[in-house]
């Protein structure tokens, strides 16, 4: 038994297949009878594969035909409820990007504009006095938020305390309250 090769096993199994008279190959396009006993006279194994008369085709549809109206793509971001630490982490990055773009814009104004930045701030005070406080709040909020969350991360890195999920969520709520108070103070305080 151990001295036989794979060819011995396949040639011994071939006569078992010859006992079948015919078999039917079915697919969606054709149904035909294949006679096995007429073609194979040697001891080689029989091949069971056949070719259909017509090849199978793939039906193509445009992407707008596949969409069902009024259904969002899956998975959609609106079905997820992000936890507070995840939202605060995303907002920390977003405020960092906004502050970097704002400082770059301010540097561009001071370098390439015909007047300095103080002239444009005074122009805002005289021409659009209703926009002074919203503009100050738009600067104070990302600045205080990014600063406070950065301090919280430094405390985490240095002390390795307060890293459980409940402590992160509670410190996040306290931090949001501190940011709201500080940004309101910076909005209404005049620095002259």
Curated annotation (Swiss-Prot):
Membrane-spanning residues: 84-113, 132-156, 165-186
Gene3D superfamilies the record matches: Fumarate reductase/succinate dehydrogenase, transmembrane subunit (1.20.1300.10)
Keyword Metal-binding included in the entry's annotation: yes
One Pfam family here: Sdh_cyt
Domain of life: Eukaryota
Subunit and interaction comment: Component of complex II composed of four subunits: the flavoprotein (FP) sdha, iron-sulfur protein (IP) sdhb, and a cytochrome b560 composed of sdhc and sdhd.
Family: Belongs to the cytochrome b560 family.
One GO CC term on file: mitochondrial inner membrane
Residue pairs linked by disulfide bridges in the UniProt entry: none
UniProt protein name: Succinate dehydrogenase cytochrome b560 subunit, mitochondrial
Family annotation (NCBIfam families): succ_dehyd_cytB (TIGR02970)
Biochemical pathway: Carbohydrate metabolism; tricarboxylic acid cycle
Taxonomic lineage of the native organism: Eukaryota, Amoebozoa, Evosea, Eumycetozoa, Dictyostelia
Residue intervals annotated with topology Mitochondrial matrix: 48-83, 157-164
Cofactor(s) this protein cannot do without: heme b
